[in-house]
Regions:
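Juxtamembrane intracellular "pre-TM" segments in multi-pass secondary transporters
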Residues: 2-13, 225-257, 466-468
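Extracytoplasmic gate region of multi-pass secondary transporters
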Residues: 37-41, 251-305, 362, 366, ...
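Central cavity-lining transmembrane alpha-helices of secondary-active solute carriers
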Residues: 60-77, 295-308
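Cytoplasmic membrane-interface "Motif A"-like loop-to-helix N-cap segments
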Residues: 80-92, 313-327
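C-terminal ends and interior cores of transmembrane alpha-helices
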Residues: 93-126, 327-341
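Cytoplasmic helix-loop-helix junction between adjacent transmembrane helices
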Residues: 131, 137-175
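Symmetry-related core transmembrane helices of the 12-TM Major Facilitator Superfamily/SLC fold
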Residues: 199-218, 430-448
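C-terminal transmembrane helical hairpin of 12-TM major facilitator-type secondary transporters
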Residues: 318-365
Length: 468
């Protein structure tokens, strides 16, 4: 029996890394679709007559169903009950449906429905129906996106447990960041080429279809691993029970990680959504090139997340790494908030530093969850963390959009956009940056609490991941 186990796919470095490539490629396609509209904030506002609040409302749609309908929690239960393969494929189909709704809402097809100009409709006070429908589609997409995220994490943990787990999770995360980086600088040239603000969504759907085919290949390998483990007499994991949710919720370290997660990501992902407009307005970078600077964030994360993950695998210190990343996050946003620091080389440097922070925390945080929660409950645990995270990702863009419109308008400028004269609102981003810095400061506190809890309970967060 020992012979069979030692020759299993999971013990083969080649098989493990092939699995990682397959899962990570689909993650990359998913992240591209998530952020494809971020560089087009100005075009959405001018073409669809949205305000910054409307744009924030649209981006907040990502978390509507995950938060209010608890779809993320159900996703985790589905994952632990039915498995990674089914959950991953289901998630991709849900993402495709959501992307289709989002495309319909933003494209001209929506405005011409039944011969009516629906872009002129307003419900929920002053929010255009186009923004509401786009947010609805983004919400459906968000259900699939978060479902796939937890499935991917559990898949990587399964194949790399006791091996290079932090490095693998870091590589998976950083490959996803390639999608974010591509979403920062390709949509605007694509818009200029097609004069269609929804064109990047079509490209995203095509990439996601390719990602589906790639993930099916992963499913074949994962099924083979199941068979090998069954033949080797390796017992299956415990079945999911509803009481597992209670057990997870009673774990104090779990909540420290969950709160740290929502605070940290609330200071990064909403920043990315508004970053291109910030770069244009504060640092006077031309629209065409403004997306290139925020793209440095995921690119630096791409290079550094595996590095820090490898350090965590060999040296440990995961809780300390999370503290360091949170401190760096605060410093970056405080520097972004200073009005006099307005030259574009400073913006480049700060985005790179933010990318380092963005590498430090996730490379240590996600492997740490696998140390405090049993593998049979891991899907539900990841889902609960992602649910808490989605509360922040839903509310913070709304908050930032509201603050910009309420307190940060400094005037308007007239520009020629697509041959038409447009009056564009100018914003001072100091207050939003201070809000992000506050999130980072509270994240530092919870990172210290997590380190203290680890010292008390002995989870081994400060110990290496690789079992010699």
């Amino acid at each position: 029996m020992t012979e069979k186990v030692s020759s299993s796919l999971r013990e083969s470095p080649t098989a493990r890394w092939v699995v990682l490539i397959l899962v990570s490629f689909t993650m990359m396609c998913m992240y591209y679709l998530t952020d494809a509209m971020a560089p087009l904030q100005q075009q959405l506002q001018s073409n669809l007559h949205w305000s910054a609040t409307d744009y924030g409302f649209f981006t907040s749609g990502y978390g509507w169903f995950n938060v209010f309908l608890l779809m993320l929690v159900f996703s985790g239960i589905i994952l632990d009950k039915i498995g990674t393969r089914f959950t991953g494929i289901l998630a991709i189909f849900i993402m495709l449906v959501g992307a289709g709704i989002k495309y319909w809402a933003i494209s001209g097809h929506f405005s011409g429905l039944f011969g009516l100009n629906i872009f002129s409709w307003h419900i929920l006070s002053e929010t255009p129906l186009s923004a509401i429908m786009a947010g609805f589609g983004f919400g459906v997409f968000g259900v699939g996106c978060e479902m796939f995220g937890i499935a991917a994490n559990k898949a990587v943990v399964r194949w790399f447990r006791g091996k290079e787990m932090a490095l693998a999770i870091g590589l998976n995360t950083s490959t996803g960041r390639i999608g974010t980086a591509l979403a920062m600088f390709t949509p605007l040239p694509l818009y200029n080429l097609t004069k269609n603000v929804s064109a990047p969504i079509l490209l995203s759907v095509l990439l996601l279809c390719i990602g589906l085919l790639v993930f099916i290949f992963f499913a074949v390998l994962d099924k083979r691993l199941d068979k090998e483990e069954a033949d080797a007499g390796i017992s299956k994991e415990e079945e999911f029970k509803v009481s597992d949710i209670r057990d997870i919720a009673q774990n104090r370290a779990f909540w420290y990680i969950a709160i740290l997660c929502v605070l940290f990501y609330s200071a990064v992902f909403p920043f990315i959504k508004f970053a291109t407009n910030l770069i244009v307005q504060k640092y006077t970078v031309p629209d065409l090139f403004a997306g290139y600077i925020p793209a440095l964030l995921p690119f630096s994360a791409l290079l550094l997340t595996p590095l820090f993950g490898g350090i965590s695998d060999k040296k440990g210190k995961a809780a300390s790494i999370m503290i360091l990343g949170s401190i760096l996050l605060v410093c970056v946003h405080l520097l972004f908030s200073i009005p006099s620091l307005n030259s574009f080389p400073i913006a480049i440097g700060l985005v790179i530093l933010l990318g380092i922070a963005f590498s430090l925390v996730p490379s240590a945080m996600w492997p740490s969850v696998a140390k405090i929660i049993p593998h049979s409950k891991l899907g539900t645990a990841y889902a609960m963390i992602f649910w808490v995270q989605n509360i922040g990702l839903m509310l913070v863009p709304l908050l930032i959009g509201y603050v910009l419109d309420k307190y940060c308008i400094i005037g308007t400028i007239t520009k020629i956009v697509d041959g038409k004269e447009q009056h564009l609102t100018q914003y001072n981003y100091t207050i939003p940056m201070l809000i992000f810095a506050c999130f980072g400061f509270v994240a530092i506190i919870f990172a210290y609490l997590l380190k203290a809890e680890d010292k008390k309970k002995g989870y081994g967060l400060e110990k290496p991941n690789v079992v010699e």
